[in-house]
A protein has these predicted regions:
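Short Asp/Glu-rich motifs
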Residues: 33, 73, 91, 121-122, ...
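Short, cationic motifs built from Arg/Lys/His that form the positively charged side of catalytic pockets
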Residues: 83-85, 117
Length: 131
């Protein structure tokens, strides 16, 4: 997590060898109310602080919601995007996007969990998310 700060990030990077280190920004289950309560900041302010840290650090990439991708077009790091939902769901994910939308916004990798792991037909569910 980028919240661990620069020292933690650099320690992880120096111990990683050839392994890529990704910094998690804000969880896709958080919204404006959550970030205000947890950090005393607006969502955008907290996200900007974490991304600034990512830019200044040696992380190889970031993990962020698809909704924040549009603000990261100039970030030359790997972008891993959870919160992918091709259909409307009633779960804890608050900032979601379809797989096609996420790739169009600049995602390098997407993360799809429950829509696949809890599907009746896992193979069909996987096919649904392939772009």
């Amino acid at each position: 997590h980028l919240q661990g700060g620069a020292e933690m990030i650099e320690a992880a990077k120096s111990a990683a060898g050839n392994t890529k280190i990704l910094g998690v920004s804000l969880l896709t289950s958080l919204d404006e109310n959550d970030t205000s309560e947890l950090y005393g900041n607006s969502f955008d302010d907290q996200f900007t602080k974490l991304i600034t840290l990512a830019k200044l650090s040696s992380v190889d990439g970031i993990v962020c919601s698809p909704k924040e991708l549009i603000s990261l077009h100039d970030l030359n790091k790997i972008k891993v995007v959870p919160g992918i939902r091709n259909t409307q769901t009633n779960d804890d994910q608050k900032r979601t996007m379809t797989s096609q939308e996420a790739y169009a916004q600049g995602a390098d990798y997407i993360v799809v969990g429950r829509p696949i792991t809890q599907a009746n037909n896992i193979e069909a569910a996987i096919e649904e998310y392939l772009v």
